[in-house]
UniProtKB/Swiss-Prot annotation:
It comes from Homo sapiens. InterPro entries: Ribosomal_bL35-like, Ribosomal_bL35_sf, Ribosomal_bL35m. The gene is MRPL35. One of its GO terms (biological process) is translation. The keyword Ribosomal protein applies. Pfam families: Ribosomal_L35p. The lineage of its organism: Eukaryota, Metazoa, Chordata, Craniata, Vertebrata. Component of the mitochondrial large ribosomal subunit (mt-LSU). Mature mammalian 55S mitochondrial ribosomes consist of a small (28S) and a large (39S) subunit. The 28S small subunit contains a 12S ribosomal RNA (12S mt-rRNA) and 30 different proteins. The 39S large subunit contains a 16S rRNA (16S mt-rRNA), a copy of mitochondrial valine transfer RNA (mt-tRNA(Val)), which plays an integral structural role, and 52 different proteins. This is Large ribosomal subunit protein bL35m.
């Protein structure tokens, strides 16, 4: 009764516990077989058969310790590849201290995907502006091509992921963002 309830609970669990379902059911089946084998070997049915003291043929020795249900090494070996992906936390690939000079490094993906204005705002494209365009309407494609500002939290995070080199003012020839670098009519 308890074993079926356990198997039902494991079967009901989703996601991470799916590999455990196969493991638990096979372990349970092995335990039942091993328990019946142990009981068959431990009974006195075969007491009248005598084995020679020294045998010329190697025989299979079966001990209760080998037949028990504790397959801890098998469980650990099966679950070892799954555990790092479960326990892995989301991280920013930010180098706080470089190996050679001990300085912070810029995350290159930030430089490729975002543009920092001198006033501290970050500009980005909308997500999915290149994806599955065949099923998007022209109006939606136009909206996705627009540039938008990042919010305060995103801007602070992006500032932490870049060095001071990327925060300096640049004077590019024919810069289309020249009029947006400085905020005007801003009441502080």
């Amino acid at each position: 009764m308890a074993a079926s309830a356990f198997a039902g609970a494991v079967r009901a669990a989703s996601g991470i516990l799916r590999p455990l379902n196969i493991l638990a059911s096979s372990t349970y089946r092995n335990c039942v077989k091993n328990a019946s084998l142990i009981s068959a070997l431990s009974t006195g049915r075969f007491s009248h058969i005598q084995t020679p003291v020294v045998s010329s043929t190697p025989r299979l020795t079966t001990s209760e310790r080998n037949l028990t249900c504790g397959h801890t090494s098998v469980i650990l070996n099966r679950m070892a590849p799954v555990l790092p992906s479960v326990l892995k936390l989301p991280v920013r690939s930010l180098t706080y201290f470089s190996a050679r000079k001990g300085k912070r490094k810029t995350v290159k993906a930030v430089i490729d995907r975002f543009l920092r204005l001198h006033c501290g705002l970050w500009v980005r494209r909308k997500a999915g502006y290149k994806k599955k365009l065949w099923k998007k309407t022209p109006a939606r494609k136009k909206r996705l091509r627009e540039f938008v500002f990042c919010n305060k939290t995103q801007s602070k995070l992006l500032d932490k992921m870049t060095t001071s080199f990327w925060k300096r003012r640049n004077w590019y020839v024919d810069d289309p963002y020249q009029k947006y670098h400085d905020r005007t009519n801003l009441k502080v």
